[in-house]
UniProtKB/Swiss-Prot annotation:
Ranges for domain KH-like: 59-143
Record InterPro entries: KH_dom_type_1_sf (IPR036612), KH_N4BP1_1st (IPR056629), KH_N4BP1_2nd (IPR056630), RNase_Zc3h12_NYN (IPR021869), UBA_N4BP1 (IPR056631), UBA_N4BP1_C (IPR056578), ZC3H12/N4BP1_RNase_Reg (IPR051101)
PANTHER family: N4BP1-RELATED, NEDD4-BINDING PROTEIN 1
Name of the protein this chain belongs to: NEDD4-binding protein 1
Annotated site residue numbers, Cleavage: 200-201, 325-326, 488-489, 507-508
Domain comment as written in the entry: The CoCUN region mediates binding to ubiquitin. Does not interact with NEDD8.
UniProt organism field: Mus musculus
Regulation of this protein's activity per its record: Proteolytic cleavage by CASP8 or MALT1 leads to its inactivation.
Length: 893
C-alpha cells in the first residue's frame, strides 16, 4: 500500500547551507523526497544562526531523510570502521546501490575513505546501527557458511545475480562469488527500502540519480513500468562487463572448433548434446531449472536472432520474449539453451582455477565431485586439499602390487564406482556386478610401474555422467588384451606415454592418448629388469617386501565376457600402494622440486657443548637466506635453520638472525614456520618491528638492524645483499659492507660459504671468521709450540704439518642433512688445540732471571701502578712466554 505524502519543515545550522545545496540532489535520490532550502524567513539583520528546510515525500522517507540531514549537519558521532579488502566490492560495486541502501536503512552518512576503511557519521543511533550492519557483513563473509537446508539457496543466488547484473560494473564478478548468506543479507537490505519510495501520486526509484520534480506525474500506468523494464534490460545488454566479454570470447572459440566433443555435466547423451547445438541460449532465464546450476550463470546476450550456428542451422526461434512476463520465461526458455550455458559455466570454472596455478586434471576432478554450482571458495579449498594430497603421494614411487592389496580394499570400491559409473544399472544389481568383477580381477597380479613389461594397452579415460550409455569394451579382443577406452588428448605409443597410470584428463579435447599397461598379458607378470631406480628401492621394500624380485604367477585364461568401465576402474585405481598420485605434470618446475625437498624431514639439532670464543659474532640476514633457499618463490624457514646449524657446528655461539615480525603470520608462501619458533625460544632469532595500520603494513627496514648489530659487536653479516643504499650512511657501515659481508649459496639443503670471502687475494675463511684480538693473543703461543706448527695469520700456505697424524681431521662423510664444512688443516688444528697440548712436550719455563728482566722491561713501557699489578698477573699466568711483544699485547688488552 502506498504511503501518504507529507510535508515537513525544520531548521539546520546556517553555516551548512552550502553543504545542503551541494548535497540536495544526492539526498533526493537517496530517499526519494523533495528538499528545499528556504533560508531565513524575512530580512533579518544580522543573518540568523539557523535556516529553514522543507521536505516533501512519503512519510517514512521524509523521516529518514530528516534524520540523515541532521546527522550530516550536526553529527553526534564520527567513526571509522575497517573491513576486509575482499569486501570492497560491496560498498563500491553494483553502482554503489548496497552502500546507498545501507545509508537509507541506518540514516547515517557513510563514505569509502580507502580500500578496507569506511567513514561513518551521524546521530549516535544511526552510527551504531551502521557499524552493526558492517560487522554483520564481515562476520558472514569470514564464516563463509551456507544457508540452512530449509532455505532456498538457489533462489537467493538467482535473485542476487539478476540484481547485480542489472547494475553491472567492474565489480560484478567479485560480487557474484560472495557467500550465499551474505548475498541474502544484501538482498534483504536492498528490498527492505522499496516501501520508502512509494507514494500516492508518484513512484521514485532508488537507483535513479536524477532528483524528482514536484510536478512529475505518475499517470503513466503499467505501460511506463513495462517500458522501464525494457530500458533497464537494454542498458544491461549494452554493459560490457568482464562476464559478457569473457562469454563473447568463448563463443568465438567454441564456434570455431565444431569438432570438439564435450561431455555435459547434466549427463545428456551424445545425441541430445548434438541436438542442443541447434538452440539459442538467451541471456536471462528465470525458470526453475536454473536452480540446479546457479553459480556463474554467465550471460550470452549478443547472439543475434536468426544467426547461423557452427553447424549451419538457424536459431531455434525468433520470437520476442517479454522479460516482465514470468510465464514466457518458464515455458519458452527452460528447456532451451541449457547445455550451452552449463558448458560455458564448466569451462569458465576450469579456466578460472587453472589461472591460479592448479592442474586441469585436479580442477576437473573436484568440479565433477562437487558440481559446478558449488561455492567457488569451497571448490578452492577442496582443490587445494587434493593438490596437497597428490604432492604428498608423489613422494612414494609405484611398486608391484599383489592381489591381497586389491582384495583388502573391496570395502571402498562401491563409493568410487558410484561416482564413475557409465551405465544406468540399478544400484543393487550394480553392486552385485561389482562384487563378481572384483572376485574375478582379484586373482590377477596388477602392476603399476615405470617400466611396463606386458603388451596390454590401456588408454586413459574420463568419467561420464550417470545415464549416458556407452560401449566400453569392443566386441573383438585379441590375444594381446588391447583395451580401448574413451580418451582425451593426443595419441601416442605406450612406450612413450607418461609413466603414471590411468588418470582423469581434461575435457574438450579430441583424439586418443595411450597409457602404460595396467594388466599383464595372459595373466603373467613379466619382469626382466628392476622396476625402480636404485635410490627408491628401500622405500618400496619397506612397504611391500620386495619390489623388484620376479614373482611367477599361474597362467590364467583370457577374460571372456566384456566388462564395463565402472567395474574395471576401482581395481585399477585401488591397485596403487600408499595412495600414489594418479596425476603428474608433463614438465618439472622449480616449485615442484622445492616441495619435493620439503618432504625430506629436517630437524634442527644444536648440541649443548661449549663453543669457541675466538670467532666473531654472526649476524644472519634471515629474509635473504630464507628467500634464497626457497628459490625466490617461498620464504623457507628451513634455510635459516640450516645456516644457523652450520655456524653452530663451527663453534659459533654468538649467532643472531633478523626476520621481520610479519613473517611469523600464517602465509602459504612461508614454509616450516616452526623453525622460527624454535630459534626464537633459543634466543637466536630477533624479530624486527612491523605492524598493520588500516590494512596496510608498516615495517622497519631489517637491513639497518643487521648493520647496527654488526657495528656494535664487530660481527659478520651473512647475506647475498650488497647494501648499496647504505654505503654512504656512515664510515663504519661502509667498512662493514666492504670487509665483513659473508656471501653463501644453497645446494638443496646444503649450506656453503666460500673459502675466500673477500676474493682470491683476501684472507681465508678461517681468518675471516676469527676475532682480530685472538690473532694477536695466539701468535706468540703458537710460536712457542713447535710441534703444533707455526701460525700464519695470512694463511697463504701451510707452514708445518702437524707432527702427530692422529690430530689430522677425520675423513668427512657427506650426508644429505649434514652441512658442508671447510677442510683446511689450520682450521682443524686450531680447533683441536686444547687436546693437542696434552701430548706434545712443553718448552722449558722461564727462569727467575728472565722473568725479572721481562718485568722490568714491561714496567718501563707501562709505568702506571694499575698496570704493574696486571703485569705480575700476566707473567704468573704465562710462565712459558718469553716474547716481550706478546706480553705487551696482553697488557694492552
Amino acid at each position: 500500500m502506498a504511503a501518504r505524502v507529507v510535508l515537513d519543515e525544520f531548521t539546520a545550522p546556517a553555516e551548512k547551507a552550502a553543504l545542503l545545496e551541494r548535497s540536495r540532489g544526492r539526498i533526493e535520490a537517496l530517499f526519494g523526497v523533495g528538499l528545499a532550502v528556504l533560508g531565513a524567513l524575512g530580512a533579518e539583520e544580522p543573518l540568523p544562526a539557523r535556516i529553514w528546510l522543507q521536505l516533501r515525500g512519503a512519510q517514512e522517507a521524509v523521516h529518514s531523510a530528516k534524520e540523515y540531514i541532521k546527522g550530516i549537519c550536526e553529527p553526534e558521532l564520527e567513526e571509522k570502521e575497517c573491513y576486509p579488502k575482499a569486501m570492497h566490492c560491496i560498498f563500491v560495486g553494483a553502482q554503489s546501490l548496497f552502500l546507498k541502501s545501507l545509508i537509507q536503512d541506518t540514516c547515517a552518512d557513510l563514505c569509502v575513505l580507502d580500500t578496507g576503511l569506511l567513514g561513518i557519521r551521524g546521530s549516535a543511533e544511526a552510527v551504531v546501527m551502521a557499524r552493526s550492519h558492517i560487522q554483520q557483513f564481515v562476520k558472514l563473509f569470514e564464516s563463509n557458511e551456507n544457508l540452512p537446508s530449509n532455505q532456498r539457496e538457489s533462489e537467493i543466488k538467482r535473485e542476487f545475480r539478476q540484481f547485480v547484473e542489472a547494475h553491472a560494473d567492474s565489480y560484478t564478478m567479485d560480487l557474484l562469488i560472495l557467500p550465499t548468506s551474505l548475498k541474502k543479507e544484501l538482498l534483504s537490505l536492498t528490498q527492505g527500502e522499496e516501501s520508502l519510495f512509494e507514494t500516492d501520486d508518484d513512484v521514485i526509484t532508488v537507483g535513479d540519480v536524477r532528483p524528482p520534480e514536484y510536478t512529475q506525474s505518475a499517470a503513466t500506468g503499467p505501460s511506463s513500468a513495462r517500458d522501464e523494464v525494457v530500458v533497464q534490460e537494454d542498458s544491461r545488454n549494452k554493459a560490457r562487463t568482464p562476464v559478457s566479454e569473457l562469454t563473447k570470447h568463448m563463443d568465438t572459440v567454441f564456434s570455431s572448433s565444431p569438432d570438439v566433443l564435450f561431455v555435459p555435466v547434466n549427463g545428456l547423451s551424445p545425441d541430445e548434446d548434438a541436438l542442443s547445438k541447434d538452440r539459442v541460449c538467451h541471456k536471462r532465464r528465470s525458470s526453475d531449472t536454473e536452480e540446479r546450476h546457479t553459480k556463474k550463470q554467465f550471460s550470452l546476450e549478443n547472439v543475434p536472432e536468426g544467426e547461423l550456428l557452427p553447424d549451419g542451422k538457424g536459431s531455434a526461434g525468433n520470437e520476442v520474449i517479454d522479460l516482465s512476463d514470468p510465464a514466457s520465461n518458464s515455458t519458452n526458455l527452460s528447456p532451451d539453451g541449457k547445455d550451452t550455458t552449463e558448458e560455458m559455466e564448466y569451462n569458465i570454472l576450469v579456466n578460472f582455477f587453472k589461472t591460479m596455478g592448479y592442474s586441469q586434471e585436479i580442477v576437473e576432478k573436484v568440479i565433477r565431485e562437487y558440481g559446478p554450482s558449488t561455492e567457488p571458495l569451497l571448490l578452492l579449498e577442496e582443490i587445494e586439499k587434493e593438490n596437497k594430497r597428490l604432492q604428498e603421494d608423489r613422494d612414494f614411487p609405484p611398486c608391484t602390487v599383489y592381489p591381497d592389496a586389491s582384495q583388502s580394499r573391496n570395502a571402498g570400491v562401491g563409493s568410487t564406482t558410484n561416482e564413475l559409473t557409465a551405465d544406468s544399472t540399478p544400484k543393487k544389481a550394480q553392486s552385485h556386478t561389482e562384487q563378481s568383477m572384483v572376485e574375478r580381477f582379484s586373482q590377477l597380479p596388477f602392476k603399476d610401474s615405470k617400466h611396463c613389461t606386458s603388451n596390454c594397452k590401456v588408454n586413459s579415460f574420463r568419467t561420464v555422467p550417470v545415464g549416458q550409455k556407452q560401449e566400453i569394451w569392443g566386441s573383438k579382443q585379441n590375444s594381446s588384451c588391447t583395451v580401448d577406452l574413451e580418451t582425451d588428448g593426443h595419441s601416442a605409443s605406450a612406450a612413450s606415454a607418461s609413466p603414471k597410470d590411468i588418470s582423469f584428463v581434461s575435457r574438450g579435447a579430441s583424439g586418443h592418448q595411450q597409457r602404460n599397461p595396467a594388466f599383464p598379458e595372459n595373466g603373467f607378470q613379466q619382469q626382466t629388469e628392476p622396476l625402480l631406480p636404485n635410490n627408491t628401492k628401500p622405500a618400496c621394500e619397506k612397504r611391500s617386501g620386495s619390489c623388484s624380485s620376479p614373482q611367477p604367477k599361474p597362467n590364467y585364461p583370457p577374460l571372456s565376457p566384456p566388462l564395463p568401465l565402472p567395474q574395471l576402474l576401482p581395481s585399477v585405481t585401488e591397485a596403487r600402494l600408499g595412495g600414489s598420485s594418479d596425476h603428474i605434470d608433463s614438465s618439472v618446475t622449480g616449485v615442484q622440486r622445492f616441495r619435493d625437498t620439503l618432504k625430506i624431514p629436517y630437524k634442527l639439532e644444536l648440541k649443548n657443548e661449549p663453543g669457541r670464543a675466538d670467532l666473531k659474532h654472526i649476524v644472519i640476514d634471515g629474509s635473504n637466506v630464507a628467500i634464497t633457499h626457497g628459490l625466490k618463490k617461498f620464504f623457507s624457514c628451513r634455510g635459516i635453520a640450516i645456516a644457523v646449524e652450520y655456524f653452530w657446528k663451527l663453534g659459533n655461539r654468538n649467532i643472531t638472525v633478523f626476520v621481520p615480525q610479519w613473517r611469523t603470520r600464517r602465509d602459504p608462501n612461508i614454509t616450516e614456520q616452526h623453525f622460527l619458533t624454535q630459534l626464537q625460544e633459543l634466543g637466536i632469532l630477533s624479530l624486527t618491528p612491523a605492524r598493520m595500520v588500516f590494512g596496510e603494513r608498516i615495517a622497519s627496514h631489517d637491513d639497518r638492524f643487521l648493520l647496527h648489530l654488526a657495528d656494535k659487536t664487530g660481527g659478520i653479516i651473512v647475506t647475498n645483499d650488497n647494501f648499496r643504499e647504505f654505503v654512504t650512511e656512515s664510515v663504519s657501515w661502509r667498512e662493514i659492507i666492504t670487509k665483513r659481508l659473508l656471501q653463501y649459496t644453497f645446494v638443496g639443503d646444503i649450506f656453503m660459504v666460500p673459502d675466500d670471502p673477500l676474493g682470491r687475494n683476501g684472507p681465508r675463511l678461517e681468518e675471516f671468521l676469527r676475532k682480530e684480538a685472538f690473532l694477536r693473543h695466539m701468535q706468540p703461543l703458537l710460536n712457542a709450540l713447535p710441534s703444533v706448527g707455526t701460525f700464519d695469520p695470512g694463511f697463504r700456505s701451510p707452514s708445518t704439518q702437524v707432527a702427530n697424524n692422529s690430530h689430522q681431521p677425520p675423513p668427512r662423510i657427506q650426508t644429505s642433512s649434514s652441512p658442508w664444512l671447510p677442510q683446511q688443516s689450520h682450521f682443524t688444528a686450531l680447533a683441536t688445540l686444547p687436546s693437542m697440548q696434552q701430548n706434545p712436550p712443553l718448552p722449558a719455563q722461564r727462569s727467575s732471571a728472565e722473568t725479572s728482566e721481562l718485568r722490568e722491561a714491561l714496567l718501563k713501557i707501562f709505568p702506571d701502578s694499575e698496570q704493574k699489578l696486571k703485569i705480575d698477573q700476566i707473567l704468573a699466568a704465562h710462565p712459558y712466554m718469553k716474547d716481550l711483544n706478546a706480553l705487551s699485547a696482553l697488557v694492552l688488552d
